[in-house]
Amino acid sequence: MTISSQEQETKKVQVTVDKNPVATSFEKWAKPGHFSRTLAKGPKTTTWIWNLHADAHDFDSHTSSLEEVSRKIFSAHFGQLAIIFLWLSGMYFHGAKFSNYIAWLSNPTAIKPSAQIVWPIVGQEILNGDVGGGFQGVQITSGFFQIWRASGITTEFELYATAIGGLFMACLMLFAGWFHYHKAAPKLEWFQNVESMMNHHLAGLLGLGCLGWAGHQIHISIPINKLLDSGVSPQELPLPHEFLVNRELVSQLYPSFSKGIIPFFTLNWNEYSDFLTFKGGLNPITGGLWLTDTAHHHLALAVLFLVAGHMYRTNWGIGHSMKEILEAHKGPFTGEGHKGIYEILTTSWHAQLAINLAMMGSLSIIVAHHMYAMPPYPYIATDYPTQLSLFTHHMWIGGFCIVGAGAHASIFMVRDYNPAQNYNNVLDRVIRHRDAIISHLNWVCIFLGFHSFGLYIHNDTMRALGRSQDMFSDTAIQLQPIFAQWIQNIHSLAPSNTSPNALATASYAFGGDVIAVNNKIAMMPINLGTADFMVHHIHAFTIHVTVLILVKGFLFSRNSRLIPDKSSLGFRFPCDGPGRGGTCQVSGWDHVFLGLFWMYNSLSIAIFHFSWKMQSDVWGSVTPAGTVSHITGGNFAQSAITINGWLRDFLWAQASQVIQSYGSALSAYGLIFLGAHFVWAFSLMFLFSGRGYWQELIESIVWAHNKVKVAPSIQPRALSITQGRAVGVAHYLLGGIGTTWAFFLARIISVG
């Protein structure tokens, strides 16, 4: 039944804590495995160390109390924040002490960013390359210099101050993590009070966060950047606080500042249009978004989130109730709708985490695509190594988060799902027609795989036979991505109707001019053709297979026709016991394991597509006469339509820089390229191995030790099947990521 507003109001929100619930004891923590009765007894076999790592953060296995688990997670979040602040502080400190930031600031197009100087011990100083301006160091590709410029940082002193601030925040977070677990730990109802949490996160985190950044941009960044853009040297600029306290200073740059806040309260908001703009496009001096546009954007978001932060009903009997919304959410084909989902999301943190990981992972991938289409910071678009690094980084982060969503969805199904509380709701109905979902998804994967790969096989065959007129290409049988081209066209034409005062389209990827900074291309229209159409369908194929594996793992994690009692076997198990062959790799854990390989496939092709497409069709230079020349001279359209083209003109041709890097400042990438290949190959030893083989080997080695009376007291054991797979997939991905990283950076630092 729905609770009325009056009844809701009687349930007052209170912040309740338990005082001193858990003693602070270094003696206890010093004991390995203190969280588990079995592990605390110490090692009998080498399996103990594996179980120690597997269970240390599996709070469900430490206690069955949801309140205690919630407190541990809450406390761990503060620890995570402390690490992030410490890392950030280190980045800012390096910028202050070891970088050429000030030199870069005065000439960002000719000088490359560096914030790491390798000390000479046994000749590593070869890695300190000449980055311009007489500075020797390792070129960095993190984008920190560009974000510092956008923040209005112009001196090393400001970087030091921020680094100290980061250290202070890290200490504060560590203290908070200890305090809220050992001294004043919130009660379970505080963690389950979703309306209050939504209000505070929306209004506080997002609303005030956006407002703070908008305020900083308006008062500090925009005036400083305007002066830098007009050629004022960083040394001549006033200190940032001058812009805050001296209104005259800013009024010279933005006249509306002289009017103060009167236009705001008299609703003449148009007065502020000199620093809150709606220009669209990119600043031609920096190749980044107009900072006055981004300030406007964050101010608008702040208003939006501050309003949204008053949306949910807490102590005042007004606003939405999450439970009511979910239970009212019924459709003609959805039975009980979302009845029971509220209870799931307030009692299963795995279910909550699965949704959050899927959302944040997708958001990270969206960020990757916006970072190059609408470069947010000054001079980031012309720093090709940074652009490539940030795209790759956000794609990887997104992929891991999405696979993590599949993992925690399966853990929820095994550990937290209660069939009795979920009768005929959407979740139950999805699980009941899972066969239809999985078989259809499987059909889609087979269709996409055969057709997309078939187009490539056809092209390779025709090219081998010398029948180029029979190939799918822009010059023979065209497969133009007409829908994508239509969307591009709409987006390039739309601003003239929807925002007539805008100077340009939102992104030059859709159409418009070539934006070049110092004759180096920042962004330009990205033409799509047959090659993009073909690669796109490979993307569709690999993504659908990844989804198939993860969704099948989640939907069949409790039971299947093959193993009806899967839920009693747990989240990870090797098979259904002796005497049941053919039941390997069916656990929820194994689906995550398999999903990781396909996630790797998907993302490799996506980042390869991006890297080659940008070098071929976007990145390059413009001559004074206006002739555009690209790094690889537009070879994508004709080469990316065959498998041989990908192998020869992308992988092999662009690997020359990393392979020939020895003896140069890029030699570290050559070594990483080699070493990461070895790490990847090492993974195969675990992925193709049989456990019995190793156990036999171990036993003969133990016999030899006994013979010479040096037998170990801890009995050696071969890795379990699951442990072997975990080591295998970890090295497979680490090796693959390391190889790609070295390949990309050696290439783009050389030619970019």
UniProtKB/Swiss-Prot annotation:
Cofactor note: P700 is a chlorophyll a/chlorophyll a' dimer, A0 is one or more chlorophyll a, A1 is one or both phylloquinones and FX is a shared 4Fe-4S iron-sulfur center.
Protein name: Photosystem I P700 chlorophyll a apoprotein A1
Protein role: PsaA and PsaB bind P700, the primary electron donor of photosystem I (PSI), as well as the electron acceptors A0, A1 and FX. PSI is a plastocyanin/cytochrome c6-ferredoxin oxidoreductase, converting photonic excitation into a charge separation, which transfers an electron from the donor P700 chlorophyll pair to the spectroscopically characterized acceptors A0, A1, FX, FA and FB in turn. Oxidized P700 is reduced on the lumenal side of the thylakoid membrane by plastocyanin or cytochrome c6.
This protein's UniProt keywords: 4Fe-4S, Chlorophyll, Chloroplast, Chromophore, Electron transport, Iron, Iron-sulfur, Magnesium, Membrane, Metal-binding, Oxidoreductase, Photosynthesis, Photosystem I, Plastid, Thylakoid, Transmembrane, Transmembrane helix, Transport
Coiled-coil parts of chain: none
Binding site for phylloquinone: W694
A GO MF term: electron transfer activity
SUPFAM superfamilies: Photosystem I subunits PsaA/PsaB
Family: Belongs to the PsaA/PsaB family.
GO annotation terms (biological process): photosynthesis
Reaction(s) catalysed (UniProt annotation): reduced [plastocyanin] + hnu + oxidized [2Fe-2S]-[ferredoxin] = oxidized [plastocyanin] + reduced [2Fe-2S]-[ferredoxin]
GO cellular component entries: chloroplast thylakoid membrane; photosystem I
Gene3D superfamilies xrefs: Photosystem I PsaA/PsaB (1.20.1130.10)
Segments traversing the membrane: 73-96, 159-182, 198-222, 294-312, 349-372, 388-414, 436-458, 533-551, 591-612, 666-688, 726-746
Subcellular location per the Swiss-Prot or TrEMBL entry: Plastid, Chloroplast thylakoid membrane
Topology with respect to the bilayer: Multi-pass membrane protein
Binding site residues for chlorophyll a': H677
EC number: 1.97.1.12
Cited Pfam families: PsaA_PsaB
Binding site for [4Fe-4S] cluster: C575, C584
InterPro entries: PSI_PsaA (IPR006243), PSI_PsaA/B (IPR001280), PSI_PsaA/B_CS (IPR020586), PSI_PsaA/B_sf (IPR036408)
Self-association state and partner proteins as the record states: The PsaA/B heterodimer binds the P700 chlorophyll special pair and subsequent electron acceptors. PSI consists of a core antenna complex that captures photons, and an electron transfer chain that converts photonic excitation into a charge separation. The eukaryotic PSI reaction center is composed of at least 11 subunits.
PANTHER family membership: OUTER MEMBRANE PROTEIN, OMPA-RELATED, PHOTOSYSTEM I P700 CHLOROPHYLL A APOPROTEIN A1-RELATED
Binding site for chlorophyll a: M685, Y693
